């Protein structure tokens, strides 16, 4: 008996809809990353993208515990000397609320080419509307 290894052409991908209203950021992100990677499937193979598509709505209503809204900072560098920049969670939520979930999930994915390909299957929207009705995403309760 041989160990089964999934092939990219044989992978069955589904679409799921997740409502982020009043969900904790880290707990939601870990479950989304798990499903994007395909680890919930019996045909999971580490070198094959076997994950599903995930559409997250109401990203602006995500919940954070403790004082993270005020204390947590997101850092980046412009590439110029002294170009370190930062924004608090409150500022990021005000400008681009979907980036909170995208950033949390990105940190939980593999840091390689396959991880970047898996992240393209994550669609995050700040409001209640999304553009993927034609794919008929199934509601997923996390």
Curated annotation (Swiss-Prot):
CDD domains: Ribosomal_L13. It comes from the Bacteria. GO terms for biological process: negative regulation of translation; translation. SUPFAM superfamilies: Ribosomal protein L13 (SSF52161). InterPro entries: Ribosomal_uL13, Ribosomal_uL13_bac-type, Ribosomal_uL13_sf. One of its GO terms (molecular function) is mRNA binding. One of its GO terms (cellular component) is cytosolic large ribosomal subunit. Keywords: Ribonucleoprotein, Ribosomal protein. Pfam families: Ribosomal_L13 (PF00572). Part of the 50S ribosomal subunit. PANTHER family: LARGE RIBOSOMAL SUBUNIT PROTEIN UL13M (PTHR11545:SF2), RIBOSOMAL PROTEIN L13 (PTHR11545). This protein is one of the early assembly proteins of the 50S ribosomal subunit, although it is not seen to bind rRNA by itself. It is important during the early stages of 50S assembly. Belongs to the universal ribosomal protein uL13 family. This is Large ribosomal subunit protein uL13. It comes from Halorhodospira halophila (strain DSM 244 / SL1).
């Amino acid at each position: 008996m041989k160990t089964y290894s999934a092939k990219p052409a044989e992978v069955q991908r589904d679409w799921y809809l997740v409502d982020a209203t009043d969900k904790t950021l880290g707990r939601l992100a870990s479950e989304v990353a798990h499903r994007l990677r395909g680890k919930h499937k019996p045909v999971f193979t580490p070198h094959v993208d076997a994950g599903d598509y995930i559409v997250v709505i109401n990203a602006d209503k995500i919940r954070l515990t403790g004082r993270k809204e005020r204390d947590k900072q997101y850092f980046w560098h412009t590439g110029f000397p002294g170009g370190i920049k930062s924004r608090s969670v409150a500022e990021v939520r005000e400008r681009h609320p979907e980036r909170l979930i995208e950033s949390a999930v990105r940190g939980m994915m593999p840091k390689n080419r396959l991880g970047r390909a898996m992240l393209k299957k994550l669609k995050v929207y700040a409001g209640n509307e999304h553009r993927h009705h034609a794919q008929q995403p199934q509601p997923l309760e996390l």
